[in-house]
Amino acid sequence: MQQNLKVLMLNGSPRANGNTSVALKEMEQVFKDNGIETEIILVGNKDIRGCIACGSCYEKGKCVFNDMVNELALKFEEADGLVVASPVYYASANATLIACLDRLFYSSHFDKTMKVGASVVCARRGGCSATFDELNKYFTISGMPVASSQYWNSIHGRMPGESEQDGEGKQTMRTLARNMTFLMKS
């Protein structure tokens, strides 16, 4: 019998119910329909320092900055999959999310191999591919299979709620969640 699968979903937007959230909620419903436990954590509006490469995490087993990154590391270790979602700012992810991911991946020393990763980006129009690539690098350097969809994992909208109208983007998120489910169950 297979254990209950868990997916940790990080929302890199500073807006809890913004356009990036629309993408995550589309995925979350597919996961729930497949009996997969989810947790969405808002990261983009938190005060998270960047990594200072002090190396203390090698001695202490966690980041020297005792904030939500250490809590996320515990949740990430227990999860079978990780979804990282970000709005696009100047063809890049939210800087707070990047600071979080740098520290999360560097300071957590558990084996990430074969945990399934997926990145999701939300933009008005441009910069998605660069941001998508930026986020996927955390997975690929960690030996994590990267889930894909039938198109780039992006949803489009600028003003609050606009991404609700992106039918293709929402379908891309549902397909992404189904593909991620398949990989986690494999």
Tell me what each language-model feature is.
Residues P14-A23:
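Glycine- and acidic-residue-enriched helix-capping/strand-helix junction motifs
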Residues P14-R15, N45, R124:
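Short, glycine/serine-rich, charged loops/turns that create anion-binding
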Residues A23-F31, L135:
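Hydrophobic residues within alpha-helices
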Residues I36-K46:
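A short beta-strand-loop structural module common to alpha/beta enzyme folds
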Residues K46-F76:
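Cysteine-cluster motifs in flexible loop/terminal segments that predominantly coordinate metals
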